[in-house]
Amino acid sequence: MFIIGLTGGIASGKSTVAGILKDLGAIIIDTDRVAREVVAPGRPAYREIVAAFGPRVLRPDGQLDRPALARIIFNDATARELLNAITHPRIRELVQKRLEDLRRANPEAIVVIEAPLLFEAGMEGMVDAVWAVTAPAPVRLKRLMARDKLSLAEAESRLRAQGEETARLRRATRVIPTGGDLEATRASVRAAWQELQRHLADDPEPGGAPWV
């Protein structure tokens, strides 16, 4: 099994790239969905979040109010670190279990872990290659405002909270730009996929080739 860590800043186009990779045959583990499982009512992380942040992060039905929680953590680094400390270990644990299940069921699979905080969550050791998705800041701002119905100031605050992406790009084995149109993104992803397929055909052991 070959595992790709797909990462990138907020509104960089990760989900679009993951969708293209799924169409090409990859199995996707979406850590945002994993996180939703981790913080479901009744789970330990849910109880810790409510204890830490109080009823202001709950909806009337008892579910976490994710937009309310996002407003808090994107404007408070200490709160963000606290939330990450609660959720990241549990997300890692569940992702590792999914990988073990997949390895038994489909040892020849190419698996993509879609994780915006791949490095911050300590998951880089799980993967054979890191593909980083990137787009210019103005493009990301426009996407974020449209997607999450944010003001310009709110969108800028969320981009700032994630910090510079230079370090992330430097640690990646492949960078996929998404600032152009969708067909250009598809072409970049297909090229990366085809190169990976060639490497796997030549040497199926990740440690034996310069993985991309």
Swiss-Prot record:
- The keyword Cytoplasm is annotated on this UniProt entry: yes
Q: Which PROSITE patterns match?
A: DPCK (PS51219)
Q: Which pathway does it operate in?
A: Cofactor biosynthesis; coenzyme A biosynthesis; CoA from (R)-pantothenate: step 5/5
Question: GO CC annotation: what is one?
Answer: cytoplasm
Chief location of this protein within or outside the cell: cytoplasm
Q: Which SUPFAM superfamilies match?
A: P-loop containing nucleoside triphosphate hydrolases (SSF52540)
Q: State the source organism's domain of life.
A: Bacteria
Q: Where in the cell is it found?
A: Cytoplasm
**Record-annotated DPCK domain positions:** 3-207
What molecular functions are annotated in GO for this chain?
Answer: ATP binding; dephospho-CoA kinase activity
| Keywords in alphabetical order | ATP-binding, Coenzyme A biosynthesis, Cytoplasm, Kinase, Nucleotide-binding, Transferase
Q: Where does ATP bind?
A: 11-16
**Record-linked Gene3D superfamilies:** P-loop containing nucleotide triphosphate hydrolases (3.40.50.300)
Query: Which E.C. number(s) belong to this protein?
Result: 2.7.1.24
UniProt keyword annotation of DNA repair present: no
A biological process (GO) of this protein is: coenzyme A biosynthetic process
Biological role stated in the UniProt entry: Catalyzes the phosphorylation of the 3'-hydroxyl group of dephosphocoenzyme A to form coenzyme A.
Family label: Belongs to the CoaE family.
Protein name, UniProt field: Dephospho-CoA kinase
Which species does the entry assign this protein to? Moorella thermoacetica (strain ATCC 39073 / JCM 9320)
Q: What is the lineage of its organism?
A: Bacteria, Bacillati, Bacillota, Clostridia, Moorellales
